[in-house]
Design a protein with these regions (language model features):
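Non-catalytic substrate-recognition and accessory regions of acyl/acetyltransferase enzymes
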Residues: 1-133, 140-160
């Protein structure tokens, strides 16, 4: 069977929804199947993602490859997004750069800094267990994360 044929699809599920549906232990079982050469990426998903989701620091989205009839489903990757604020001092950038950046944020006259809100793609990783990394490219995973950011922008507004 050609695993990347038109008989397959990707399913993205928020880790918080998985926890609600099958509990924390069930979610941990799914996450334990994830392996990655980058141990920081692997350890975040296995040991921090649940706590970060519960505390609303960030939201992790698991990406599964599935047959159309969903008889086969494999965890192929994940990405994590979070709200982020950057404070930029006028002294640290050129006047022209500051003028451009200030269009995206709010100037605080007391601190003399411009605060800009953004959405951070904090983690992104492919699952190398049992060759699952061949079921998705890094570009596809990044596009899913960027599309999620664009959807958030559409829902809440803001300029990113």
């Amino acid at each position: 069977m050609d695993l990347l044929s038109n008989n397959s699809k990707y399913i993205q599920i928020n880790l918080s929804d998985i926890i609600k549906a099958i509990g924390e232990d069930g979610a941990k079982s799914i996450l334990s199947s994830f392996s990655c050469p980058n141990k920081d990426v692997e350890n975040f998903l296995r040991y921090k993602a649940i706590e970060f989701s519960k505390r609303d620091f960030s939201k992790t989205h698991l990406v599964f490859w599935s047959t159309l009839d969903e008889t086969e489903k494999y965890l192929v990757g994940y990405y994590t997004i979070a709200p982020k604020f950057f404070s930029i001092s006028k002294d640290n950038v050129s006047n022209s750069q500051y003028k451009k950046l200030s269009q995206y944020g709010e100037y605080d006259t007391h601190s003399k800094k411009c605060t800009i809100s953004a959405i951070l793609i904090g983690q992104l990783g492919k699952n190398y267990t049992a060759g699952n990394d061949t079921l998705i490219t890094g570009d596809e995973l990044l596009k899913m994360a960027l599309d999620k950011v664009k959807n958030i922008q559409t829902e809440i507004g803001g300029r990113y």
